[in-house]
Amino acid sequence: MVILMSDSKLAKSHYWTKNYSSRNGQKIDKIIIHHMAGNLTGKQCYNVWKSREASAHYAIDSKGNITQLVHESYRAWSVANRYWDSRSVTIECANITGSPTWRVSDATMKSLIKLVADIAKRNNIKIRYTGGTGGTLLKHKWFMSTACPGPYLDKKFDYIAKEANKILDKKTDTTTKKPSSFKVKVTADGLNIRKGPGTSYKVVGCITDKGVYTITQTKGDWGKLKSGEGWICLDYTKKL
């Protein structure tokens, strides 16, 4: 598995589809959001695209897990329009209900907002939802005869843009806090332990037991394990 510098580190699994093409030098300046019209995982999307000429760069399941399927440096086959696909990074979101609302879970929404902010930051995109293609956050239905991304997501685009911009506008906390130690319970099936407080640091281990751990220091959303093994992201824990 090869992860490129241009790809999101938020993706914890990767299934590389063969359904992609060159961007032909086109700069990325748009993000297109889709819904899956089903409650699928990233791997299930990958399997569907084995027999369909379609793809997206990322898929988010109903638990909020992000899977990458196409490198951002390539054009995914997302809206059957070379011009728009060449300019876009595309995201598929799982549904927890069917027609007519096609809702997505809170976990999916949270991951979607983080991913949109991450894509925008790395590609120097200013997140703007204008209700049309002049903005940078776009809907699938604007390019094809489809209801995608469904009524629920359709009404959330302004919210997604605002919340993603809050992440980008948040000042980086450069001060390491040293509070009294506290305990957390891991809520993720697999939580990476990193050498330092951030995804740019090397993975040195993984917690898979959903156990209780003591945190001795915090920095932003990261906590240092009492064992000294490293740091974990506190977004995937519950404070006790």
Feature annotation, model-predicted:
Residues 1-85:
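N-terminal catalytic cores of peptidoglycan-degrading enzymes
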Residues 37, 89-99, 142:
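Cell-envelope and extracellular/periplasmic
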Residues 172-192, 206-209, 218-219, 238-240:
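SH3-family beta-barrel domains
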Residues 226-240:
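Boundary regions of SH3-family modules and the immediately adjacent low-complexity/disordered segments
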